[in-house]
């Protein structure tokens, strides 16, 4: 969401009928959007750690912006380096960035769980926000 320009950027993967329809939308077409829904985030963390994988990184970008430049750390994972096109966007917002890829093409080889225990051990975070594949969310919740 860019309030100054009055624009909304959507990031999605074409999987089902709805995203196929969305892929056919052209610049200038009108869309109806409902939201935000839910309860939002507790923004009181002083040292937030954002943990995301795959398309789960999209909503965390908006959250990082909400915390302000340099406040959050990001631990991001993807299948390959190509899936981590987000790095430039997050570099502008986060004080530290930790990367993992399943194939080891960038960052640490493995999932975000490869780095999470060390980040917890080192401290430096007072709240963890996670979005992404269910196995990652489950692993973070039990770490």
Summary of predicted features, one role per range:
Residues 1-27:
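Ferredoxin-reductase
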Residues 17-143:
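FNR/FR-type flavoprotein reductase catalytic core
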């Amino acid at each position: 969401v860019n309030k100054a320009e009055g624009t909304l950027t959507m990031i999605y993967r074409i999987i089902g009928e709805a995203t196929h329809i969305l892929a056919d939308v052209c610049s200038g077409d009108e869309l109806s959007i409902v939201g935000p829904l839910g309860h939002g985030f507790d923004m009181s963390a002083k040292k937030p750690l954002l943990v995301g994988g795959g398309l789960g990184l999209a909503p965390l970008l908006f959250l990082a912006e909400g915390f302000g430049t340099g406040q959050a750390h990001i631990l991001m994972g993807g299948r390959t380096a190509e899936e981590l096109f987000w790095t430039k966007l997050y570099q502008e917002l986060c004080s530290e960035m930790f990367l993992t890829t399943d194939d080891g093409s960038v960052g640490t080889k493995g999932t975000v769980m490869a780095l999470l225990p060390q980040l917890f051990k080192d401290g430096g975070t007072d709240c963890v926000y996670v979005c992404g594949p269910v196995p990652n969310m489950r692993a973070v919740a039990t770490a």
